[in-house]
């Protein structure tokens, strides 16, 4: 076997060659190439004239001496037009029912069937056997067929509860294509003089028969780690709970796992990684509604769980809560003591903040938690200007409970010791205190926990950086995952600075 990284580089160069002259079709080419290299089937959905047939023709050039067969289905298509005509001579001389398959689907490595849903039952039944078993019954004999890639296309989806669903379920990869959108790409497409039938792939990059057969065995040796399986099972469980989720058969899940193994193999890895699971967005949908739903669920999986983002945020929340508890234990030492002002001519006693309190936003800790506005509150954030005005003139005072949401109206007073006290609806009070002095730094317990959490974050980010070199995953998905990890890292660093 070639060095894994050399193989990944070769497949990347092969894909680049196949993509030449095709605009906004890189993802489709790459997934069709992955399907061809792993012996799977692809369904292309989209309007006429958007290069669906050209994509299939291009894939022929990925292999040395590959034969291609393409056919436009109609309601009047016959098995003879797809699988070959009957041999009149064999029927006449020997009474054998045998087809002449040369130049037809049974002898092609790359097959493209357009308007697939117009095929009749006779064609569909034979096609199912060809896809499932890679076999073709020719008269009394069962012959192996060399098909590596079947690309089926249509501008519509099969009708629900029809005889076509069995065939549709065999189309592992499903891609929804549209017209060229970008202005520059549209211009380049209009002015391109490239002959669509030219072979754009150098001989050295083409896959030999021996390589293809060897790779099929090696793909099966790619491992599925426990943590990746847990992510897959989490996705499956979540889909089962959603009323509008598409039905995904066990067969489709199993075939999808082999596709993930192929993605890892041709990316130079020995095991499936979380990043490979993004491919499931092109395997599990059924129609337009389920396409959006599947993408949303996989996005949640990738940005929330695949690299432990949500788990790290939960740990961070617990550390921050513990830090606040430790600060509350010290609140008597740091209770906010106001300065009483002379009020000779004022009916209301006036106060001001201590001179060492200068922040524009003040976070004050409750000596004991209270339930305010149906929320368990441990600290309140005040705008300094609003608090100063209340201390001077009285009236209404508002603050953000636990520092989140909108500022809420509070029952606040100054007690006889010149401390601020907040009261709940039952008039239970809690003295407000300043957080511990920054000079004291973080408690050792909190500092250690944050350092351990940051170390785990660095490990997860390093794993993602290693795994994201995957030809078959769109860059925008990788960008969202990077953003989610950076957000977690930023929150950890912010907590370390408190």
From Swiss-Prot:
<dbReference type="GO" id="GO:0005524">
    <property type="term" value="F:ATP binding"/>
</dbReference>
<keyword id="KW-0067">ATP-binding</keyword>
<dbReference type="Pfam" id="PF12592">
    <property type="entry name" value="ATPase_RavA_C"/>
</dbReference>
<dbReference type="GO" id="GO:0016887">
    <property type="term" value="F:ATP hydrolysis activity"/>
</dbReference>
<dbReference type="InterPro" id="IPR045427">
    <property type="entry name" value="MoxR"/>
</dbReference>
<feature type="binding site">
    <location>
        <position position="23"/>
    </location>
    <ligand>
        <name>ADP</name>
    </ligand>
</feature>
<dbReference type="GO" id="GO:0005737">
    <property type="term" value="C:cytoplasm"/>
</dbReference>
<dbReference type="InterPro" id="IPR046932">
    <property type="entry name" value="RavA_LARA_sf"/>
</dbReference>
<dbReference type="Pfam" id="PF20030">
    <property type="entry name" value="bpMoxR"/>
</dbReference>
<feature type="binding site">
    <location>
        <position position="49"/>
    </location>
    <ligand>
        <name>ADP</name>
    </ligand>
</feature>
<feature type="binding site">
    <location>
        <position position="53"/>
    </location>
    <ligand>
        <name>ADP</name>
    </ligand>
</feature>
<dbReference type="InterPro" id="IPR041538">
    <property type="entry name" value="RavA-like_AAA_lid"/>
</dbReference>
<dbReference type="InterPro" id="IPR003593">
    <property type="entry name" value="AAA+_ATPase"/>
</dbReference>
<dbReference type="InterPro" id="IPR027417">
    <property type="entry name" value="P-loop_NTPase"/>
</dbReference>
<feature type="binding site">
    <location>
        <position position="51"/>
    </location>
    <ligand>
        <name>ADP</name>
    </ligand>
</feature>
<dbReference type="InterPro" id="IPR050513">
    <property type="entry name" value="RavA_ATPases"/>
</dbReference>
<dbReference type="Pfam" id="PF20265">
    <property type="entry name" value="LARA_dom"/>
</dbReference>
<dbReference type="InterPro" id="IPR046898">
    <property type="entry name" value="RavA_LARA_dom"/>
</dbReference>
<protein>
    <recommendedName>
        <fullName>Regulatory ATPase RavA</fullName>
        <ecNumber>3.6.1.-</ecNumber>
    </recommendedName>
</protein>
<feature type="binding site">
    <location>
        <position position="52"/>
    </location>
    <ligand>
        <name>ADP</name>
    </ligand>
</feature>
<keyword id="KW-0547">Nucleotide-binding</keyword>
<comment type="subunit">
    <text>Homohexamer. Interacts with ViaA.</text>
</comment>
<comment type="similarity">
    <text>Belongs to the RavA family.</text>
</comment>
<dbReference type="InterPro" id="IPR022547">
    <property type="entry name" value="ATPase_RavA_C"/>
</dbReference>
<keyword id="KW-0143">Chaperone</keyword>
<feature type="binding site">
    <location>
        <position position="50"/>
    </location>
    <ligand>
        <name>ADP</name>
    </ligand>
</feature>
<keyword id="KW-0963">Cytoplasm</keyword>
<dbReference type="InterPro" id="IPR023671">
    <property type="entry name" value="ATPase_RavA"/>
</dbReference>
<feature type="binding site">
    <location>
        <position position="196"/>
    </location>
    <ligand>
        <name>ADP</name>
    </ligand>
</feature>
<feature type="binding site">
    <location>
        <position position="54"/>
    </location>
    <ligand>
        <name>ADP</name>
    </ligand>
</feature>
<dbReference type="Pfam" id="PF17868">
    <property type="entry name" value="AAA_lid_8"/>
</dbReference>
<keyword id="KW-0378">Hydrolase</keyword>
<comment type="function">
    <text>Component of the RavA-ViaA chaperone complex, which may act on the membrane to optimize the function of some of the respiratory chains. RavA functions as an ATPase.</text>
</comment>
